[in-house]
Regions:
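Positively charged, low-complexity intrinsically disordered leader regions
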Residues: 1-28
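Short beta-strand segments enriched in small/hydrophobic residues
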Residues: 31-39
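Glycine-rich phosphate/diphosphate-binding loop of Rossmann-like nucleotide-binding domains
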Residues: 38-52, 134-223, 232, 236-247
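Short beta-strand elements in bilobed, periplasmic/extracellular small-molecule ligand-binding domains
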Residues: 55-69, 183-185
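Short, well-structured alpha-helical segments in soluble
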Residues: 75-87
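Anion-binding alpha/beta catalytic cores of soluble intermediary-metabolism enzymes, centered on
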Residues: 94-154
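Glycine-rich, N-terminal phosphate-binding loop of Rossmann-like dinucleotide-binding domains
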Residues: 96, 207, 227-228
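Rossmann-fold NAD(P)-binding glycine/threonine-rich loop
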Residues: 104-125, 228-280
Length: 286
């Protein structure tokens, strides 16, 4: 089975569109997402366009703040502070990567935790690991949603996550653990990686190496989630999984493009609604 992330994300966005109309009726305004981009990185610009397009589709207020490549860290932090203090703003996202002279850690920590739609703020990360209510990072959240929508059972299953990044590998392993999977985190130093992966009922590839996961890594019938986005020399987008080789072996697989990518943006929209509702709730209680 091919898990069609494009189709699933579209149906979720359609549902959110209706939800946003109801929220506007109830609260007198729509969720508002501010996206900040620094410089002219073409890949970043493409991602940002996709995010703004999704806000428009779902009926949010989505605004782009464009800052020059030579923008100082202080100027960026001042802009974040302005948005933190703006009651009309529900979500703030700074598109990564940033120019070398700006500290990503400082920028992520500067965004108010309650407006952190990426789920990267240290407070949200801590709350995830402490099993407390938090904004979840978009890609891991999207992966769980894809598995659920495809009817893949998680509880009691063996899951292997290849990759230990703070953005995907570690948080998705925690979400799988929370759903009662038995989780192994594998990485570049794992001995006999293929044998470890062959144990998995659910295999998540998030290493950033084109077509690294071949058929010998996959247990017949396993669900394979490909998080990788790699560009070949010919300019073609491919994942971390050798899709054509693994497709006949896997029970379910996400393609690249059209798998995890669309879900990441859709979960960003979901997180913006959550930030809006959290803020409206605390405003009502106050």
């Amino acid at each position: 089975m091919i898990i069609d992330g494009k189709l699933i994300s579209q149906s979720l966005k359609d549902a959110m569109k209706i939800e946003v109309e109801a929220l506007e009726q109830q609260y007198g305004r729509r969720p508002c997402l501010m996206v900040i981009i620094v410089g002219n990185n073409p890949a970043s610009r493409s991602y940002v366009r996709g995010k703004i397009k999704a806000t428009e589709y779902c009926g949010f207020d989505g605004h782009l703040v464009e800052l020059p490549e030579d923008c100082t860290e202080e100027a960026l932090l001042a802009e974040i502070e302005r948005l933190n203090n703006d009651p009309a703003v529900d979500g703030i996202l700074v598109q990564l990567p940033l120019p070398k002279h700006i500290s990503e850690d400082n920028v992520i920590a500067a965004i108010s935790a309650e407006k952190d739609v990426d789920g990267f703020h240290p407070e949200n990360v801590a709350r995830l690991w402490l099993n407390q209510h938090c904004i979840l990072p978009c890609t891991p959240k999207g992966i769980i949603e894809l598995l659920d929508q495809a009817g893949v059972e998680i509880a009691g299953k063996k899951a292997v996550v290849i990759g230990r990044s703070n953005i995907v590998g570690k948080p998705v392993s925690k979400l799988l653990l929370d759903r009662n999977a038995t989780v192994t985190i594998a990485h570049s130093r794992t001995k006999d990686l293929a044998a470890v992966c062959r144990e998995a009922d659910i295999l998540v590839a998030a290493v950033g190496r084109a077509k690294m996961v071949t058929a010998e890594y996959v247990k017949p019938g396993a669900a394979v989630i490909d998080v990788g986005i790699n560009r070949t020399e010919e300019g073609k987008l491919v994942g971390d999984v050798d899709y054509d080789a693994v497709l006949p072996v896997a029970g379910a697989i996400t393609p690249v493009p059209g798998g995890v990518g669309p879900m990441t943006i859709t979960m960003l929209m979901r997180n913006t609604i959550e930030c809006f509702l959290n803020r409206m709730g605390s405003a009502t209680e106050a």
